[in-house]
Amino acid sequence: MTNQEFSNEFDVLYNNIMSNQAPGLDEYEKSVFLTKAQDEIVKNYFNPKGNKYQEGFDGNEKRQIDFSMIMRSTKISSGFTDGVFDSRGKVVIIDSDVMMILNEYATVTRAKSEGDTNSTSETVRLTIVPINYTEYSRLMSKPYKRPLKWQAWRLLTNDGTTKKAEIIVGPNDTLTTYHIRYIKRPQAIILSNLEGVTLDNKTTAQKCELDPILHQEILQRAVELAKAAYIGDLNSNIELGKRSE
């Protein structure tokens, strides 16, 4: 759906649902509602409890097709810094647009001789296990206090400006590459160039990045949000909490 089609169909649906009683919306206002609708739909699709089908990303092949256009893969082989939470860890800067990590693994150089990092080494692939800080504390209370032989731990952190992952490997491992596949946050839907205002720090027109199969859902959701904003009553907002995705 083009930006013009989004705008035109928004007007039709909005006027129908409001019986032409509400004032018209300009392109900026429609862009705000469309972008909010897009973000809500993406988040609800990834949270099984947030949609009527009770299915997350891996629960339905259609979900993977729907979001294939904002799926990214990358590997990071440099720029590692020492861990701030765990002395064994290495901190990796990840892309700022990461919305949800799908899967990840690490490549490490492993010393073959236990306890001797200068011995002949081999390259090993480790499955990364994402953990939160509560889980980290629990694991550190155990006798071995380290990941299993073929695993590494990952903690997420943020210094206020950049998103970071702290990768914790075993005592004989040296991190060489971090591989990640993720869903990026879709860019804002901006129907036309903006003057005097911004949306997600952008002023130029931008199209919807999601698969066209989702465009009608985004449009319908945006109109519902606009209606609730105009009516402003509690019941409308409660109904919006009952996700239709």
Please report, for each region that a protein language model flagged, where it lies by residue:
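Glycine-enriched, solvent-exposed interface loops adjoining structured elements
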Residues: M1-E245
